[in-house]
Structure formats: structure tokens, C-alpha cells
Amino acid sequence: MTIAVIIPVLNEARCIGQTLSHTTTLGFDDLIIVDGGSSDETGAIVELFADRLLAPHSAPTQPPPCIRFLTAPPGRARQLNAGAASSRCDVLLFLHADTHLPMNARQAIATALSDKACVGGRFNVRLDSDRPLARLIGNMMNLRSRWSGIATGDQAIFVRREVFEQIGRFTEMPLMEDIEFTRRLKRAGRLAFLQDQVVTAFRRWEQNGPLRTILLMWTLRFLYWIGVSPYRLQHFYRMVR
């Protein structure tokens, strides 16, 4: 079983280097970074990292993944689809640029997908802060996901390639592409809700205040569930940020 990790980026210079350093040690086959038009040093950091990894003096403990840096029109769904189209791996794992996978991520995915009825899944999430509120947010995200059967991008969604193609890839919409995708994915078969944790940055909540961010996210998801267009939600999101 071959597994590709696909990371969409847009101005992620502050964190992409650390994420690449960690992810390349985990034994994946492809590592595909898809840039949606960064204006910072994201591209330069990725290219320098790839050059260093493949340098003759480099001595990794295991063969490094095939690293590719692509560009695509801005929009997370477009970037994810572009990355998926560039890989022929059996399994696609979609990872945020500020998120680190557990050390056993590859084995956990392989074990989950050894069940032929399982079409994909996600990991539990933990925020990289010791604040009690951060722990509460992570726990609530995991409970909400298990209760609803829906995964979000923070949780590192993975899927069999053939199922990804069969259900129509990510719908190219400005928001909620992860929720819309996993709605379709869970109709295709069983999802694995792995207890192993990815660690993601608390910065998104800190930038605009944790409580304000939680309220905004819950409001957006509620409006989406009752049928408000993602394009209208994008307009609302820009207004209140």
C-alpha cells in the first residue's frame, strides 16, 4: 500500500519547514505541496528543503518520499485536487501545513484500511497548547466528529484513491469543502475514526480570540447545515474577520 501526503499551502513560511521535517521521517511514499499563490517564502523553503533532503551527504534512516512542489489556483479544494491528480499512490492523506502527524501514522492508516469495508478516515486532533481551553476545544472537535460521522481538515482526512475518484473528488467551493467531501465519503463505506492524535497549531484560535473563533466556526457550520451557500458564507466570513 502506497500513501501520498498532500499539503495545501498559502503563505505558510512560519510552519511549513517544521511540518516537512517531521513528515519526511514517517515513511510515506509521496509528499506533495500545492501552493495557491503564496507571497511569502513558502515556495523557497519547500524547494530548499527538497534539495537538502536529496543531497548526496544526506543520510536519512529510511528512503525519503518523492517530494513535489506544485502550484494551483487559490482555494483549498482546488489545491487538494491538484495534489491528488499528481500522485498515483493507493491512499491519499490530506494534511494542513501547521499539523503534525503521529509517529505511527502510516501503520495506523494501513491497519484501518486492511478492512476492505473501510474507505477512509481521520485522526483525533490535539491543539499545541497547554491551556485548558485548548484541550477542551480539541476534545469537542473529536466528539463532534465521532457523533456526526463528519471529519474536518484539521483531523488529517485519508481516503482510498479509487474511492476518491468514484465520489468525485473535492467540490471546488470556497468553504466547507472538507465537510461536504466527508458527507459523500461516509456514504461510500465505513470511516475509521482513529484515536491516534495529530497535533495542530492553536494560532487560528489565538489570532482572533478563542471564544470568538469558536462562535464564528459554529455559526458558519450551522448556516451550512441549513443550506446557506458556501459563497454566501465566504462573504460573511470576510465581513466578520
Predicted regions, residues:
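Short, well-formed alpha-helical segments that are part of the catalytic scaffolds
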Residues: 11-25
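Acidic helix N-cap motif at the loop->helix transition within catalytic regions
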Residues: 14-18, 40-49
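A conserved acidic beta->alpha catalytic loop
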Residues: 22, 35-44, 99-100
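Conserved donor nucleotide-binding strand/loop of the catalytic core
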Residues: 32, 43-86
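Acidic donor-binding/catalytic loop of UDP-sugar-dependent glycosyltransferases
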Residues: 41, 97-111, 183
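Short aromatic/hydrophobic "clamp" motif used to bind/position activated sugar donors
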Residues: 92
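Conserved donor NDP-sugar-binding/catalytic core segment of glycosyltransferases
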Residues: 103-133
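Hydrophobic helical membrane-anchoring modules
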Residues: 183-241
